Amino acid sequence: MKEIGLNLYSVRNLISTEEDLLATAKKLKEAGYSFFQYSGAAWDPKRIKRMVDEVGTPVRLTHIPQDRLLNETEKVIEENLSFGNNNIGLGAMGWDILTDEKKCKEHIEKYNKVGEIMQKNGCKFFWHHHNFEFIQYNGQPIFDYIIENAPYINYTLDTYWLQLSGVSIIEYLEKLKGRIGCVHLKDFKTKFFIDEKEIPRFVPEIESVGYGVINFQDVINKMREVGVEHYFVEQDNAADLPDTFNQVERSVKYLKKEIK
């Protein structure tokens, strides 16, 4: 692979100040990343533009808080366009609505309207899913309901959360053909340990790309087939580990060396 991006949320512990952001962005570029998703640091369009201009790494996706997406849609569009980005996303749907089908569906309709406004202004709205979108109402996953009923919503498909949900990554790529402009690449592994009560535990864990169980060559072949434009490594847990930079560096090295 040639062009690979990183969701900066993965290194949020390294970008807390403007100077840290610039230094980390330069280091990530040297490691092989070509562009970024801006997330996980203070929202300042001027700061973001400075990074884009000085480091030469465009921002091709952002995650914006729910209240701003819903109540300041036009302002959010203006801010993103100021640093050259027209892909604007929701990081996660609200937990508080998951147990209320009516409220959840009303919420989805509001985001569909956000997507319509963005489309009219030359932007696209992207929904980043997790595993909880696979909660079912009357036998249908929430995610499938969104796909069928919200035509102005595009998707940032996430390999880890699909794997954890127990669904086929390939099948959802096909199902969303033409609506997946961005993807999050992160690997999946099972961690084994014995807890304090001496009970064996098996828990899912995010891993660097190529170091878990997902067949990324097959997955990326399908992503190319369905028209994915922007590939972002995302490792939510990297910022909590002592070797944060190494965690994301080995992902980009794997993708550049091993994926044809």
Where are these regions (language model features)?
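Acidic-and-aromatic substrate-binding clefts and catalytic sites of carbohydrate-active enzymes
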Residues: 13-18, 35-47, 64-73, 95-99, ...
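Aromatic/hydrophobic pocket-lining residues that form the small-molecule binding cavity
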Residues: 21, 45, 73, 104-107, ...
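H/E-rich (His + Asp/Glu) clusters that bind or coordinate divalent metals
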Residues: 214-220, 226, 230-234
